Amino acid sequence: MTQTLSQLEHDGAFIERHIGPSVSQQQHMLSVVGATSLDALIRQIVPADIQLPSPPAVGEAVTEHEALAELKAIAGRNQRYKSYIGMGYSAVLMPPVILRNVLENPGWYTAYTPYQPEVSQGRLEALLNFQQVTQDLTGLDLASASLLDEATAAAEAMAMAKRISKLKQAERFFVADDVHPQTLDVVRTRAETFGFEIVVGKAEEALKDDAVFGVLLQQAGTTGELHDYSDLMAALKARKVVSCVASDIMALVLLTAPGKQGADIVFGSAQRFGVPMGYGGPHAAFFACRDEHKRAMPGRIIGVSRDAAGNTAFRMAMQTREQHIRREKANSNICTSQVLLANIAGMYAVFHGPEGLKRIAGRIHRLTDILAAGLTQGGLLLRHRSWFDTLTIEVADKDVVLSRALSFGINLRSDLASAVGITLDEATTREDVLALFAVLLGDDHGLDIEALDASIAQEVATIPAGLLRHDAILSHPVFNRYHSETEMMRYLHRLARKDLALNQAMIPLGSCTMKLNAAAEMLPITWPEFAELHPFCPPEQALGYRQMIEQLSGWLVQLTGYDAVCMQPNSGAQGEYAGLLAIRRYHESRNEAGRHLCLIPSSAHGTNPASAQMAGMEVVVVACDKQGNIDLHDLREKAQAAGEQLSCIMVTYPSTHGVYEETIREVCQIVHQYGGQVYLDGANMNAQVGITTPGYIGADVSHLNLHKTFCIPHGGGGPGMGPIGVKAHLAPFVPGHQVVKIDGVLTEQGAVSAAPFGSASILPISWMYIRMMGAEGLKQASQMAILNANYIATRLQQAYPVLYTGRDGRVAHECILDIRPLKESTGISEMDIAKRLIDYGFHAPTMSFPVAGTLMVEPTESESQVEIDRFIDAMLAIRSEINRVAQGEWPLDDNPLVNAPHTQAELVADWAHPYSRELAVFPAGSEHKYWPSVKRLDDVYGDRNLFCSCVPMSDYA
C-alpha cells in the first residue's frame, strides 16, 4: 500500500536513534521479563497513585535537522560583540587540534569519572598535566584536578582555611575589596551557612582584626591593579592567619607565583587556557595548597601509584576525604569537577609550551601597555600604574562612552564609578586597540600602534619588579614535546585510546545514567553564537540565550511538576546545596530558624549528608527495612522527635536501592505534617520522566542532573549541571546574582556559582534532547530504561541474586547484584568481577554502593539488546569462571579474576598461570576487545607514597 506524505514525514526518527532496542527487540525483552507491553510493565512497577494522568506539556518530537535549524535561529538572536569586560572571563583562541580531538571527540567527552583507573589512564595522565601546570604557576606543592569555577573555589578556600586554621575561636573571614564581585557573592553565600562573618576592606586592614582566621586576596585586582602581598602574607603567617590568593592563570605566566610569596592556598579560573567564555561556563578552576594541608583539600586529586606488575600508573588519590566515603564529614560535597575543561586547559599548555605561553601572555601585556600609552597621550587618566591586561580609565561621562562603545560593537566594563574597565586577551588585535582608541578618544585620535610601541620606555615597568617571575615554568618534557600539530594529534589519540568510553562499550554504572550523548545535541556547543558571549554582557545581546534558557526551564517545570526552575548550579552536588539553602531561607523567613535537622535515609548517596552539612544542617539518619525501603515507623518517630527543629528530608526516587517505594507519598506527608520540607534528589529522574514527577509525588524541591537524565555528557568527570526545581513557596529563595539580574526568578538571594546561569553553554544539549524526543519520546526513554534493567535482572538473577526488588519482584531503572554470598563461598569479590569485566570489554558497574559487596547496574535506554546481551553473557561467563575457582580448578590466588585485567605486555611475557593466554585476554572473542594499559592498581601504595606531579617520561606506560 502506498504511504501518504504524512506517514513518510517521520518526526519520531530521533527517538528510534536514541532508544537502543528496536521494536522487535523490545518485544523479545518483554517476553523474557513476563510483561505484555511497556505500559503493562510500568503498571506492575510504578505505584498507581503517582502515575501521571496526562503527559507533560513539552510538545511533540521534531527531527534532528528541524531542531538544529530551530536552535540556530534562536542562537542568531545573540549578538557577538567584542567583550573587554574582564572580571575573570576573556575571549580565547582554542587550538583547532584540541577542538577536534578533545572537545568534539566522544572518546574524551563520554567517559565517566575515573573511579576505575585501569580504564582511565589517558585522562588521568591529562589531569596530571593540569595539576602540574597549576603547581608550576602557583608555586605550591599540591594541586587538585579542578573545581567548578573560580567563585566556588574561593568558597572552598574559605572552608579549607577554617579547617586548617589554628585559630579555632576565630569566626571571621577577611576579603580584600578588589576581588571580583561574583567571587565575593559566592563566598558570602557559603559563609551564611557556616556562620562565618565576612569582613570586606583594604587588604592591609586584615591585620587590624584579631578574630580573622583567613584572608582572601586577589593578585591582579578586579580593576586591574597588581599587588605584591609578600609582606602582608608574612605578617598574616606570623599571626597564624591563612592566606588565600585568587590569581589569573595567564597573568601567572609572567607574575611571581603566589606560593613563593607566602600564600597557603591559590586558586583561579583556567578558562583563559583555551576554553570559550560560553556565557559563563563550563570552566575549570585550579586550586593548590601546601603539602602539609593536603588532607584538608577539597576536590579530586590525581596521584601516581603502581599497578600489580610494578609499573607506574595513575589514580584518584586520597578518596577518603571525599563525600562518597566520609559523607557529612567530607571536606566538600562536590563530587564532580570539570575534567573535560581541565583537560582542554592542560592540553592548551602542552600544545603551546612554556615559550608559547610566555609569548601569548607577553603579547597581551604589551598590547595593554600600548593601549595605556595611547589613552594617556590622549589625555585620559588611568586609576592604576600597574597592570597585566586590565585598565580602569576615568571618564567624564561614562554613559556616553559606553554607548559609543556599543556602536562599535564593543562591550566595556560598566559597573565602576566614573570609570570604565578594559581587559585585553589573546584574541585582541592591533585593529581592536585602534577601535578602542576611537571609542575613548574619538575617530581623529591620530595614534599609531607602531609609534606607541616604540615610544614605551623600557624602564617604565607596569609589572612591578617584585612581581616579575624569574623561575622556569613547565619544564617537564610533556610541555616541550608536542608543539607540532602532528605530534599533538597523535598524543591526544594515544591518551584517548587508553580509556574506555561510550564510543567503545556500554558503561553500566548504577546511579550514573550513562546514556547516549547524540551528535546533534553536541553540535550547538561549538557554535560561536553560544561560545563567545561574556556572562556579564548587556542582556539585549543575549536574547537567544535567554530564550533558550526560558524554553528549557519551562520544559523542566513541566517534567518535574514544580513551579519554577533555577539554572545556576554547576553540578548535582551544587544543586543539592542550593535546594537546601532555599529550604533554610524559607524557614528563616517564617521565623523558624531553629529548623536545622535534616532526615536522610541510610541508603542515601554520600553527597546528601555532605550537602546538608554544608547548608548548616545536622543529619539524622532514618533506617531502612529489610526490603531496602524507608522504615516508616522510624521516620515517624524521628520526625516527631525533631518537632520544630525538623527542616527537611532528603530522599531519592526511585530509591538508591533501585526500587519504587510504594509509600513515597506517605513519606512526604509525614515530613510535611511536622513542618518539614521534602527534598527529592533528582539522581534517578531517568526513571520518572513522563511517568511521574517529584511535584506530583509531593516533594518541594529537587535538583536535576542534566548530565544524567538530559544527555549532557559526563566529560570524564565533569562538566555537569544541577538546576533546581521548586514549588512556588520556595521560589523567592533560590540563588540570585549580584552582577546580573536573572529574569523570571524573584529572588535577592546570594549566588552559588560565578555565572548567573551556571554552565550556560552546555544547556543547548538538554534543549536539543527534549526538543527531539517530545513528551512521548521522553516517556518511552524512561520506560525502556526500566525494561532494560529488568531484562538484566531477570537474566542474571540465577547467577547473581538481585538484592532489592519492589512489587512483583521488579526493579526500577537499575538493579543491585549481591556478590556477598559468592565472596563468602569462593573468596572472589565484587572488585575481582569488576576488573575481569575489563577483559570482556566493559566498564564495571558501580561497586559497593549503596551496599558494600554489591554491583549496581544501570543500562539506560540507549543500549540495544545486542549490547545488553553481550554484557549479560560476560557476567554469566565470569560466573562460570568463579565456579571453576570454587571447584578447585584454579587456585584462589592465581586465576583470571584476581589477576584481571590482563594487558598486552602480559600476553607476550613468560606465562606461568594455570589458565591460557587466550582465556585471559580474549574471553569473549576479539571483536569488542579493549586493551587496558595497566594492570590492577595498588591503591594502598598510592596513598602511602603520595605523588601528584608529572613523572619522568620513561615511567609512562
Curated annotation (Swiss-Prot):
One of its GO terms (cellular component) is cytosol. One of its GO terms (biological process) is glycine decarboxylation via glycine cleavage system. Keywords: Oxidoreductase, Pyridoxal phosphate. This is Glycine dehydrogenase (decarboxylating). Its EC number is 1.4.4.2. Its cofactor is pyridoxal 5'-phosphate. Gene3D superfamilies: Aspartate Aminotransferase, domain 1 (3.90.1150.10), Type I PLP-dependent aspartate aminotransferase-like (Major domain) (3.40.640.10). It catalyses: N(6)-[(R)-lipoyl]-L-lysyl-[glycine-cleavage complex H protein] + glycine + H(+) = N(6)-[(R)-S(8)-aminomethyldihydrolipoyl]-L-lysyl-[glycine-cleavage complex H protein] + CO2. The glycine cleavage system catalyzes the degradation of glycine. The P protein binds the alpha-amino group of glycine through its pyridoxal phosphate cofactor; CO(2) is released and the remaining methylamine moiety is then transferred to the lipoamide cofactor of the H protein. It is an enzyme of class 1 (oxidoreductase). GO terms for molecular function: glycine binding; glycine dehydrogenase (decarboxylating) activity; pyridoxal phosphate binding. The modification N6-(pyridoxal phosphate)lysine is found at K708. Pfam families: GcvP2_C (PF21478), GDC-P (PF02347). CDD domains: GDC-P (cd00613). The glycine cleavage system is composed of four proteins: P, T, L and H. The keyword Transcription regulation does not apply. Belongs to the GcvP family. InterPro entries: GcvP (IPR003437), GDC-P_C (IPR049316), GDC-P_N (IPR049315), GDC_P (IPR020581), PyrdxlP-dep_Trfase (IPR015424), PyrdxlP-dep_Trfase_major (IPR015421), PyrdxlP-dep_Trfase_small (IPR015422). SUPFAM superfamilies: PLP-dependent transferases.
